[in-house]
């Protein structure tokens, strides 16, 4: 009986592990800038990679550390840089969508605390297909312009 229970636990454990490792959509090199004391919003950057055989549509991003996370694109209108809200991000099979300064990004508003260099912002990304992934974005310096290359504890 004990051997049967052991085999059952191992079998279910392996099924769970296979589902976790079979994830074919990734959000990596996620980062954001440190927030000044008086700011309650921040742009989030990174790479959304689709290694699946079908199109994926990112439709919702949430964080326990913010009231709202929206998808935006920076646009230049009448000589001024502004942002427009986008409903979803389409990623073709084998393609990568880049979230970067002066381009497409996620905007977290209503932050529930100041984020300082080395902190992490936890994100949940949900897709039209029903897939959902978790990610962590590392907080860089106020002047950061790209993913911080040094290894930080929250990403380990």
Regions found by a protein language model. Give the residues of each.
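Secreted/extracellular small peptides and ectodomain modules produced from precursors
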Residues: 12-15, 152
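Compact, glycine-rich, soluble single-domain proteins
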Residues: 23-156
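N-terminal signal peptide c-region/cleavage motif recognized by signal peptidases
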Residues: 17-22
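Sec-dependent signal peptide recognition
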Residues: 2-11
């Amino acid at each position: 009986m004990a051997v049967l229970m052991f085999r059952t636990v191992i079998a279910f454990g392996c099924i769970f592990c296979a589902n976790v490792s079979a994830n074919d959509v990734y959000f990596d090199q996620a980062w954001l800038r440190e927030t000044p004391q008086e700011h309650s919003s921040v742009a989030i950057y990174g790479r959304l990679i689709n290694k699946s055989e079908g199109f994926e549509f990112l439709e919702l991003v949430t964080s326990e550390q913010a009231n709202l996370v929206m998808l935006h694109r920076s646009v230049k209108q009448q000589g001024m840089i502004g942002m427009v809200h986008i409903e979803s991000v389409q990623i073709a099979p084998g393609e990568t969508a880049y979230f970067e300064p002066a381009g497409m990004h996620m905007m977290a508003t209503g932050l529930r605390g100041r984020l300082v260099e080395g902190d992490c912002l936890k994100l949940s990304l949900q897709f039209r297909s029903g897939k959902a992934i978790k990610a962590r974005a590392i907080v860089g310096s106020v002047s950061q312009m790209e993913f911080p290359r040094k290894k930080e504890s929250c990403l380990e």
